[in-house]
Regions:
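Intrinsically disordered/low-complexity terminal segments and short unstructured peptides
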Residues: 13, 47-49, 88, 99
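N-terminal functional modules and adjacent low-complexity/disordered segments of proteins
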Residues: 36, 52, 91-94
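A short, surface-exposed loop/turn module that caps and links secondary-structure elements
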Residues: 39-71
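Arg/Lys-rich, positively charged N-terminal/basic patches that mediate binding to nucleic acids
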Residues: 1-40
Length: 104
C-alpha cells in the first residue's frame, strides 16, 4: 500500500532557518534525513525509524487527530505532517524546533 506524499516549496522553506543554526554538514544531513523519511512515508504511511518518535500531535493548532510529527537530529528538529488515511495522502506541513512549533 503506497501513500501520496506532498512536500511543497512552503514546506521546504521552513527548513531554511536551520541553515543558520547548524553547520553546513549538519544542515545537509537534516535535509537528507527528511528526504529519507518522505520515502518511508510513501511506502508505509508512517516513520518507523527507531528514535524518531513518530506520533500524533495533541496540542492546538494540530489537535484534530490528523497531524503527526517525528523528531530528528538529536530530538531538536520536529517534522510535522498531515495524514488523510481514507485517501492515503500525506501533506508535509513544516519543520520546527521546540521553540518555533506553532501553538495556541
Amino acid at each position: 500500500m503506497s501513500w501520496t506524499v506532498r512536500a511543497s516549496a512552503d514546506f521546504w522553506a521552513t527548513v531554511r532557518p536551520f541553515k543558520d543554526k547548524y553547520p553546513e554538514r549538519e544542515y545537509l544531513a537534516i535535509i537528507r534525513t527528511i528526504r529519507e523519511a518522505i520515502v518511508e512515508l510513501e511506502e508505509k504511511g508512517f516513520v518507523s525509524e527507531t528514535g524518531w518518535d513518530d506520533h500524533r500531535l495533541m496540542k492546538k493548532p494540530f489537535d484534530d487527530g490528523n497531524y503527526f510529527e517525528f523528531h530528528i537530529h538529536d530530538d531538536d528538529v520536529l517534522v510535522v505532517y498531515f495524514k488523510r488515511v481514507r485517501r492515503q495522502t500525506i501533506r508535509m506541513i513544516g519543520v520546527f524546533s521546540h521553540l518555533t512549533i506553532p501553538s495556541e
